[in-house]
Structures are given as structure tokens and as C-alpha cells.
């Protein structure tokens, strides 16, 4: 198990080319298209720089489609107004400043973040916060399963 805990993120992560992402100014329709296939998408400032600025998930959809009369969430002391309209962009509904990790961090570091922040995935970024990939609990489980099956 020690070898597993010391494994670097870069050895397990899914590379950026294989993960869902969109620009922060993407429209509501693009967001819904992406989320109808995947449970999340990383949000980057633009496709040239690829700096991670947020994440959109199924929970973000839920937060924004619940009728105002059923919402428990309050912002600035008042109930939020519906944000679903054609002009809505991903930046309006995403979770800002997601928890991130570097490719040099270890599985132990990632597990601590998953536990501390009660999350299931992390964006893997370089020192300039550019998206390199992602690591998920599911990936760690698959890696651990592989190790158990292939060691005697």
C-alpha cells in the first residue's frame, strides 16, 4: 500500500485531451449539451491559456433549476432569482476556484483533499493553473484494483 500512497498524480491522472472542459463564456446550451453526457466539466478562462477558473457539475444544474419557492439557498440575505435564460454563461453558474492539485503531488495528498473538501475529482494543473488533466476517486480505485490483482 505504501507504493500506492506514494504514487504521483502524473502517473494516474487522465490527460487534458480526454477530459471535459469548456470556456467560462460558454452559453447555457453548450453547458447542457456537455452535462447531458458527463457529470461535470472543468471551466477554463479560454482555450489558448487553459487556466482553470471553475467546475460545473450536476449540482450546479440542480441549484439553478429548483423553483425559487423551493430554494433554501440565500445569497446576500435574499433568495436567489432564477438564472436560467439564454444569456446565462457558464461563469454565472459554475463553482469558482475549485480545489486543484499538481502532477507532483501524491495519492496521499489527493486523498486528503478528497476527504477534507468532500469532493470526488481534482483538476491537475501546472504552476500557472493551466489544465493538465484530472484525477478522480474512480481512477484511484481502478489503480488500487490493478495493483491488488497483479501482486501476489
Residue ranges: model-predicted function:
Residues 1-152:
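Tandem CBS (Cystathionine beta-synthase) repeat/Bateman regulatory domains
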Amino acid at each position: 500500500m505504501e507504493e500506492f500512497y506514494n504514487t504521483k498524480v502524473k502517473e494516474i491522472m487522465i490527460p487534458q485531451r480526454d477530459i471535459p472542459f469548456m470556456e467560462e463564456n460558454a452559453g447555457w446550451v453548450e453547458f447542457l449539451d456537455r452535462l447531458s453526457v458527463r457529470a461535470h466539466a472543468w471551466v477554463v478562462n479560454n482555450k489558448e491559456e487553459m487556466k482553470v477558473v471553475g467546475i460545473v457539475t450536476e449540482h450546479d444544474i440542480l441549484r439553478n433549476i429548483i423553483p425559487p419557492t423551493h430554494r433554501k439557498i440565500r445569497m446576500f440575505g435574499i433568495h436567489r432569482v432564477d438564472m436560467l435564460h439564454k444569456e446565462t454563461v457558464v461563469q454565472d453558474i459554475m463553482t469558482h476556484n475549485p480545489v486543484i492539485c499538481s502532477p507532483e503531488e501524491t495519492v496521499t495528498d489527493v486523498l486528503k483533499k478528497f476527504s477534507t473538501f468532500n469532493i470526488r475529482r481534482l483538476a491537475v494543473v501546472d504552476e500557472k493553473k493551466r489544465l493538465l488533466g484530472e484525477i478522480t476517486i474512480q481512477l484511484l480505485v481502478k489503480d488500487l484494483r490493478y495493483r491488488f490483482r497483479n501482486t501476489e
